[in-house]
Amino acid sequence: MELAQTLSQRQTMQMAGQMLHSLAILGMSSQDLSEHLTEQATSNPFLTYRAPPAFIARGGEDFDAVGAVAAHKPSLMAHVVDQIEMAFTETPDRLLALRFAEALEPSGWLGQSLDSIALAAGVSLSRAESMLAVLQGFEPTGLFARDLSDCLILQAREADILTWEVETLIRNIRLIAENRLSDLADLCDCDIGDIPEIIKQIRHLNPKPGLAFDHQPTPVFPPDLIAVRGAEGWTVELNRATSPTITVREDRFADGTADAKARAERRRRGRGPGAGEALERRGDTLLRTAAVLVARQSAFLDKGPAHLVPLTLEDVASELGLHASTISRAVSGRMIQTQTRALPLRAFFSRAVSTQGGGEAVSRDSLDFVQRTVGGEDRQNPLSDDAIVTLAERAGLRIARRTVAKYRSTLGLASSYERRRAAAAR
């Protein structure tokens, strides 16, 4: 009886350990997973790790998976997408932020004008400017700068050295390159002997913060999944180019060995199949989750963000018979490649707001309502947030006042007091 109980406890502990391992692997990015499997294969002679084809393509036949992982730096896009997911909860915000991220040059500067980004995203210039202000607060400071001067001014402000003289020199940085110290002194209205010290402060700044990240010729953020539009709808598959494999080397294990080292290796060998099974479960969960997202949001893929339908983590978890936290791990940091662009899986989720008819409308509709309402108001008598709430109710949308304020902020719209003051100043 006691022996049976002990065995049962051991089995329970083993199952719990395997479950935790599976959950940990599910939450890993492709790069983190490769690092984890490389470490396992390095410490266990019975395991063979095979890097994803995307990694092998970086180094050709002599590619060293261990060395590559050790030398790995996160890509600029991966770094930025992580911050986007933390900074924004609304899908429209994330999609707009992703548009900006796609416009980044290796230097970390924007490679497109604000006008072109706003046009491509289908938003107003004021909203694009509001989004840029948030993105320029990302780390490292200087990302999303529009040019060299913009980059250096952002960093000087953070370093608390942005005096009038420093800003003047930065905005006339061409004169520094030409060593025209006298002209710079005239612009700054200071002694020429003060200029070298100001230049020294500027030279401590980083003109190209994006270069601290990995810029291999492979995609900066390889998608984990691929969605294809066919005659009968959308289909989803795993991106095998980013899928690693791990196998047990039976030929390296010989029965009959009895020394302590061999017994220790036998125990390590027992963990081999667990890693392989966890990998399979990870791929299966990713694929099933993505299939539900694509099926539910096919109109979003076909027609754009305005056609998102309400969908939460709990909805997907219920359909798959999984816990919401498992779905959260599955979608965190994951990208899916469509025929036009790569999207984060979290872009497929959208919260709902109540309508007077008892149904639900996606929050994008409320966002658009606020934008249209403020855009069409009398400039001399701008609408208060309470007035917008009342108009929304008449239109069949139930939006809280604090939600209106949040949407205004998202759209880059000022308060009614500030809009009235701006109109009076014209």
From Swiss-Prot:
Extract the PROSITE patterns matched here: SIGMA54_1, SIGMA54_2, SIGMA54_3
Could you tell me which residues form the DNA-binding region? 312-331
Pinpoint motif RPON box by residue range. Answer: 400-408
Q: What are the record's GO terms for cellular component?
A: DNA-directed RNA polymerase complex
Q: Does the keyword Transcription apply?
A: yes
Positions of the UniProt region annotated as Disordered? 257-278
**GO molecular function annotation:** DNA binding; DNA-binding transcription activator activity; nucleotidyltransferase activity; sigma factor activity
Keyword set, alphabetical order: DNA-binding, DNA-directed RNA polymerase, Nitrogen fixation, Nucleotidyltransferase, Sigma factor, Transcription, Transcription regulation, Transferase
Protein name as it appears in the record: RNA polymerase sigma-54 factor
The scientific name of the source species is Rhodobacter capsulatus
